[in-house]
Amino acid sequence: MIPIDPWIILTLILGFGMAWAIGANDAANSMSTAVGAGAITPKQAVLIAGVLEFTGAYFFGKTVTETIRKGIIDPSKISDPNVLIYGSIAALLGATIWLIIATKYGLPVSTTHSIIGGIVGYGIIYGGIGIVNWDKMVRVVLSWVLSPIVGAIFAFLVFRALRRTVLQSEDPVKSAKRWSPFWIGLAFIVIGTMFYIKVLHGSSLYIGILKYGIPTGIIVFIITSMLLRVKFPNVDPYLGAEVIFRKVQVITSGYVALAHGANDVANAIGPVAAVYTIATMGLAGAKVPVPRWILALGGLGIAIGVATYGYRVMETVGKKITELTNTRGFTIDFSAATVVLIASWLGMPISTTHTVVGAVIGVGLARGVKAINKSVVKDIIISWFVTVPVAGIIAGIIFKVLLLIG
């Protein structure tokens, strides 16, 4: 039974609101390329994303989380548990308000950067700029720049290779039958490895590749090769090639949703778990346990967020940046997953949201600069750079008010 503590009740409500905002903005990215390419309808997308986001959050979300995300401020300098409670509430509200504003305008922003901004905001109000781990902040800023650039370059190169091996051949359907098992198998090596690292929270890249990635890729390669032996109807050869990648794109997008639920639910339930642990046990360590029912609350909030408001960001990423087809959508999912995997292995800071958007831009650039909606890209980039300061300012104001009335 949930203890009847006003701080716990308030934080649960705010945590659910943050999870809803994550679903409406960040989680919508997972299915945006599939919707933009016409692989599935928006209604199908929100249903699939909602189920997989909840599954990822509840069954694969970490049962131990950080009280202060990414060690962005020094927890040893916060000795008063009430400060951590007020700060958690302020960070949640600051991040949630900014996410709702960004989502209203269809701008895909990083939920991790939003909650980090909220934490920095209340941290500076409480302990001054010295409380912030500026080395970590530099890594966060680097991720703003590196993620979209690396995602764009990788997607550009992958799509050029895919276009040369399949779409520009004399018989695209025949080439797709020959080459798509290779491309799809390669994608599932990455997906299998990512499942081990991001969903099962494994620590060894080599174990992930050898035990999960390669076996998954080989199985999918064999199955795809067998399925493609069927004859395609006499249609436009380019459309025939796109059809081959359509169903696969739904699977790759679905994986992104599952992994997102497992990882980013911590942005909503981390502060909730911190307040719950302090209020019920008097503990205020750097890490706290996360009860399953809190994971369920976060997963439910994300799922409802996708279903009720996710269409705005889906439309921006899937339709407004550049025109997408199934091969382009597949390229984006494959490229984003690969870049995130490599970055995790190298210990580089990276934003999945920024990487996906960068990959969309990269695929568009493979067709020429004119294929990109530059005004939309400009608005997105501006929103990325104001995420941390805006969330921080809002959280700082809320924290100051809580200190005055607390």
UniProtKB/Swiss-Prot annotation:
- Transmembrane residue ranges: 2-22, 45-65, 83-103, 114-134, 140-160, 182-202, 207-227, 265-285, 288-308, 330-350, 385-405
The cellular component terms of Gene Ontology attached to this UniProt record, alphabetical and capped at eight, are: plasma membrane
One Gene Ontology term from the biological process aspect of the record: phosphate ion transmembrane transport
Q: Where is the signal peptide?
A: none
What's the superkingdom here? Archaea
Q: What is its main location?
A: membrane
Q: What does the UniProt entry say about where the protein is found?
A: Cell membrane
* Molecular function via GO: phosphate transmembrane transporter activity
Q: Which UniProt keywords apply?
A: Cell membrane, Membrane, Phosphate transport, Transmembrane, Transmembrane helix, Transport
Q: How does it sit in the membrane?
A: Multi-pass membrane protein
Q: List, alphabetically, the PANTHER family matched.
A: PHOSPHATE TRANSPORTER
Task: Identify its protein family.
Answer: Belongs to the inorganic phosphate transporter (PiT) (TC 2.A.20) family.
Role played: Potential transporter for phosphate.
What name does the UniProt record give this protein? Answer: Putative phosphate permease PH0640
Species of origin reads Pyrococcus horikoshii (strain ATCC 700860 / DSM 12428 / JCM 9974 / NBRC 100139 / OT-3)
